[in-house]
From Swiss-Prot:
Entry binding sites for substrate: R28, Q29, A30, G31, R32, D78, Y155, S210, H325
Pfam families (UniProt xref): URO-D (PF01208)
Pathway of action: Porphyrin-containing compound metabolism; protoporphyrin-IX biosynthesis; coproporphyrinogen-III from 5-aminolevulinate: step 4/4
Gene Ontology molecular function: any one: uroporphyrinogen decarboxylase activity
UniProt-listed Enzyme Commission number(s): 4.1.1.37
Name this protein carries in UniProt: Uroporphyrinogen decarboxylase
The family this protein is said to belong to: Belongs to the uroporphyrinogen decarboxylase family.
CDD domains: URO-D (cd00717)
Keyword Lyase set for record: yes
Length: 350
């Protein structure tokens, strides 16, 4: 552990230190709302190229850093990026998300999956993270991220995103032993991948269990929570000082369960009032969030008022200011700039 005072702002807050204002970053802060990103996309139309060619992914990751100086700079990637390393071939269709060419639905397919070897399968991740650390130094915190077992299983089994998750739920409720095998293999691969990101330079790691909010609480306890715990426990065994964040979309019904995952920080979405989230999670749990991304369509006064309201409700400890999910593609770029400007002045405004 380095001298604390040189640690960047977000990392200090994520460790539970008292800071003068909540650190701020934004999910999907590198993305389509930025003209610089859209220009680069014309040159590199394939998402996999943009996220797997190191110099391109480095440039994209740093676009919001150069524009807004957020307290966190996150790796530009996708949660399905490690799947080919297990033998699950995929592509990422523009505007549609991941597509798995041969969905995993049988015992035989699961048995054929191989352990993840990130040095061989994902060497570009190390190059990108090392470059981000070098670029931002102590001025910002470099974040890595991974998908959670349930959510990666949902993509692998469904073959793509879904509104109903009927195929994976059919598997979960009809042949649970098969799904548990897949979830176990995914959890172990995700833990290996997260450790690799930390070893490559990630200072904080967020795990996205985007689709776990589609589960009833009792099914969350069976198919999501134990595997979140498995991932976090394995990371903590080797990297006990790296703060870990958990996100579940539509998490209002499972918020307390998220607090049992082993995460250090729970991302709260906008369907839960931040004051209620604080009360439900308890004083020891740190939180991230939770503005509705739609707020960024509004007037500057409205945006400022919502930021101040969120920060007041979160209190003066253990809060990372963020949206409740990713910034929307048609958000006015100047409103994102204003969001960051306001966030940087919170020690005066609140």
């Amino acid at each position: 552990m380095g001298v604390t005072s040189t640690a960047p702002h977000l990392l200090r807050a994520a460790r539970g230190e008292i800071v003068d204002r909540p650190p701020v970053w934004m999910m999907r802060q590198a993305g389509r709302y930025m003209k610089a990103y859209r220009d680069l996309r014309e040159k590199y139309p394939s998402f996999r190229d943009r996220s797997e060619i190191p110099e391109v992914a480095i440039e994209v990751s740093l676009q919001p850093w150069k524009a807004f100086q957020p307290d966190g700079v996150i790796l530009f990637s996708d949660i399905v990026t490690p799947l080919p390393g297990l033998g699950i071939e995929m592509d990422i269709a523009e505007g549609k998300g991941p597509i798995i060419h041969a969905p995993i639905r049988t015992q035989a397919q699961i048995e054929q999956l191989r352990p993840l070897e990130p040095e061989a399968a994902l060497p570009f991740i190390k190059t990108i993270l090392q470059a981000l650390r070098q670029e931002v130094g102590h001025q910002s915190t470099v974040l890595g991220f991974v998908g959670a077992p349930w959510t990666l299983a949902a993509y692998a089994v469904e073959g793509k995103g879904s509104k109903t998750y009927s195929i994976i739920k059919n598997l979960a409720f009809s042949e649970p032993a098969i799904l548990h095998q897949l979830l176990t293999k995914l959890a172990d691969a995700i833990a290996i991948y997260a450790r690799y990101q930390i070893d490559s330079g990630a200072q904080v790691v967020q795990m996205f269990d985007s689709w776990a909010g589609q589960l009833s609480p009792q099914d969350y306890d069976t198919f999501a929570l134990p595997y979140q715990q498995r991932v976090f426990q394995q990371i903590k065994q080797t990297h006990p000082d790296t703060p870990l964040i958990l996100l579940v979309s539509g998490s209002a019904g499972v918020l307390e369960r998220m607090g049992q995952s082993g995460a250090d920080i729970v991302t709260v979405d906008w369907t839960v009032d931040m004051a209620d989230a604080r009360a439900r999670l308890g004083k020891q749990m740190k939180v991230q969030g939770n503005l509705d991304p739609g707020v960024l369509y509004a007037s500057k006064q409205f945006i400022r008022d919502r930021i101040i309201d969120t920060v007041r409700k979160a209190g003066n400890w253990g809060h990372i200011l963020n949206l409740g999910h990713g910034v929307l593609p048609d958000t006015p770029e100047e409103n994102v700039a204003f969001f960051f400007e306001t966030a940087k002045q919170l020690n005066v405004l609140v």
